[in-house]
Each structure stands twice: as structure tokens, then as C-alpha cells.
Amino acid sequence: MSIQITTELVKELRNATGISVMQCRKALEEAEGDMQKAVAILKKTSSDIALKKADRNAADGAVSVKNAGEKTVLVALHCETDFVSRNEDFLKLLSDLTDKALNEGIDKMKEDSKEMIDGVIQKTGEKVELGEVFEVTGPVVGNYVHQGKSAVIVSLEGGNTELAKDIAMHVAAMRPEYITSSDVNDEIKQTMNEIFAKEVANIDKPEDIKEKMLEGKMATYFKEKTLMDQPFIKNSDQTIAQLLDQNKAKITSVKRYSI
């Protein structure tokens, strides 16, 4: 005798899993009305769907940063389209993964992430995969997340959290490639010197003038690329180095991630 799959039973399974009504009904029919078996069937289906989508390109996504005490974690979650990156289930998954990484540790989060991700793959129909995950610890840490697509975490020695947040926002906006001029290696300097030397080579000026022009181009280029030399985005009359000196602070780390 066949088991009648009631609307209430389907609704109960849907509320428990978030999976579509059609898939819930199908799972309940296959499980002959057994709720636990139906949940297991849906999990197996989620895993199978994820496997089929494994070779797709998940180039979009979102990033989340959360902190508690002296610990800050960043988690990036990738999907195929911007549409899904704004999906409620996708964003809840990202939030849950970030909470788990913060409260239980990154390794534990990664262990538990597959089943959580597979469920969202089944709901959205897109490939979803875990991206960059890292942790920053320290007494003074600030972060800035821009439109859920990029994030910066800045750790300071001295200063305060608001200062760290301001510098994180600056880094997100200005995208410096180096923290200090000493971070620029000789190979990069040589490459840029050759590029700018070609630009001034045919200028009708004396050699000493061209040499000064070359030096000026080099100085301007690396000033724009170096965090400490950049004018602070909130006060262009002050460089980041001057801002830090004013607050008796030093940068100990800058981490940035963009989808």
C-alpha cells in the first residue's frame, strides 16, 4: 500500500531543508514518507549535483569578515554569477561558514563545509565553492568590506581599532602594491626604470634634465603604489606614514582579498 504524501509533510521537509517543494515531495515519495530517509536522499542528491557541477567556473561570489576579541577571520565563497552571490541562501551560508571559522576554527569549518555547500548548490543550481580563508589575531585589528566583493584586514601595533579600520578602507580604495618603499625589490625597480627610460629617451632635452625626469617618474610611480607614501583618503594633506606617526602606531600586517 502506498504512503500518502501530504502537503503538511512536504512543508515540514521544506522548512527543515530549504529545498524546493518538488524535490521534497520526490524525496518523500522515494522514502515512503519517512522523514529521516527523505533528508538523507536530499543530501545524497545535493552531493551528486555538486559533483556534476565541479568542472564549472565559479568566478563570482562574496566575502565576509567577522571578529571576536583579538581574532578576525575572512571567508570567501565563490559561485558562478552575481545573481547567486546576492541570493539569501548563499549569503546565509557565507555568514554561517564565517561564524563557524571564528568560533570553532578554520580547520573544523573546512571539515564541515562540504555538506553545507552541497545544500546551497542544490538550491541555487550553481557551482558553489569555498575560496580564501584566513585569520588575523592581534590587539588592534580593523577591517573594511566593500560591497561584499573585497575586504581588507589591517593589524596595528599601537593606535586603535578605528585607525585600523580607516587604513583598511584606504587600502581597499587606493589598492597599494607595497607597504613601504623597502618592499619594492630591485627587479621591479629595474623593470620600471627601463620603461620610463624609453619614455624620456626621445625627448629633446639635455641628458641631465632627462635624468631628472626619469627620477621624477620613478618617484611618482612608487609613491602612488606604496601605502606609507600615499595621501590618506580622508585627509589628502597627510600621508599614511604621517597618520601612523601622529597616532604612535605601526602596521604589522595588511591582508586583502577580492572576488
Regions from the language model: what does each represent?
Residues 2-259:
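N-terminal assembly/interaction segments in proteins that build large macromolecular machines
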